[in-house]
C-alpha cells in the first residue's frame, strides 16, 4: 500500500513538473524594434533591432537559426550594424563574414525579370540553449524607388516579445495616416527639428498560436499600418497608372483565345483559364517596389506576379468586350486612408473566396471606391435513395443487416468541419470561409418485410452559432431521414467556440449514421 501511495505522489509531482515545461515558449524576444524613416530627399530607411533568446533545439535549429532580409541592390543598400550571439556564460560570438550568405529569394525563382533581387541569409553562429541572438540592420532605399513611405507590420510572432517598439518618422509637412489594428495601444506623437515621429510601444506581447491559422480579418493579431499617401485613392493610382489599354498584343491574344466562344461567359472562362495557367511569381507588391511589368511582357514570359496576372486578365476581358476591373483588398481601418499599398492582401478581378469574406475586409476598385462583390450560393440540397432489402447491406449475426447513410461528397463535413475543430477549445477568433446551409435527405425504401431496429433519432441543436437538426419520418414502405446544418455566425470568438464545436460534433456524428434492420420476419 505504501508503494502505491509513493507512486501516486511521484506521478503527481512529475505532472506538475512537466506541465509548465510543455507550455513554455521555444524562444523569447527580449527586444524587437522597427524604425521607418522618410527623409526630405525622398530616401527611406527601415531599421530592425532584435534580441532573441533561444530555449529549445527547435528554436535553435529550425525557427530562428537564420534571419532573412530581402532587398533590391539596384535601389537599396543593406547595412548590418551588429550581428552576434551572447552565449549562456556571457561569451560573445560575432557572426563571421562567411555566415552572411546572399541568395536569390525563393519567390523570385523561375522569374528572370526579378532575378536582380537579393536575399541576405544571416546564419547565426555560436548557438546553444540559453543563447541570445543580437541583430541590428538597415535597408536604405534611394529616392524615387518607393513612391511613399508605406508600412504594414504584423506585431505578434511565434514567441513572446517582452518589448516591442515601432516608430515612423517623416518630415512634418508630409501627410501621415496611421492606425493600430486589433489593438488598443495609443502611440506617442512628437514633432522636433521639422520631423514628426509616431511611436508605438507594447510590453509582453503574447505569441500567436503556432498550429492555428490567424489573420487580420479575424481580428486575432495586431498590426500597424502607416503611409504618407494623401489618400487611399492616391496610393492606388501608383498601380492604376501602370495598367495599359488597347495594347495590340493583348487584343490579338484575346481574339485568339476566345475565337470559339459562344457567349461572354465562355469568353471569361477561357481567358481566366489562360491566365491561371501562367506561372506564378510569389513576390509581393512591396518586394517588386510596387511595379508591374507591361501585359505584353507577362504574355511573352508566361509568368507573372499576382498583380501582373490580375492586370492582364482585366485587359484581356476588356479587349473581348467584357466589363472588368482590378480590385484591391485592404484591412478594415477606422481611418479609410490609413492603409497604403503595403497593406493590400490581394489584387484580383473575380474571386469567390473574397466575396464570401467581404464583410471582414475592405474591397475597393482602383479609384478607391467600395465594391460589393456578388457571392456564390453555398446552399446544398441533396437527396439520395437507399434500398433496404433482404440481400443488401452488411450481414450481421442473429439475422440483422447493417446499412450506412450515403456520405456527402462535398459540403462542410468533408473538410471545413474537421479542420476547424481539431481542438475542443480555441484561444483566438475563428473566421469561417463561408456560412454553410446544407440539407441532406435520404429516402430509405424498405422491401422484403424488413423491420427497422436502429434508426437515427429526431434531434435539434440550436444555439447562437447555428443549427443542426435531424428528423426521421416513417411510413409502411419508406423512411425519410433529413439532416440539416445552417450556421449563422462567420466570426466565432473563443467564448462562442464551444457552441460551434458542439454543432460540428453532432454534424459529424449524423454524417456517419448507420441503420440496422432485422431479418427475422423477412422473406429470405
Functional labels for PLM-detected ranges:
Residues 1-9:
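Bacterial N-terminal signal peptides that target proteins for export
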Residues 9-17:
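Bacterial N-terminal signal peptides
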Residues 23-524:
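A sensor for short, sequence-defined functional sites
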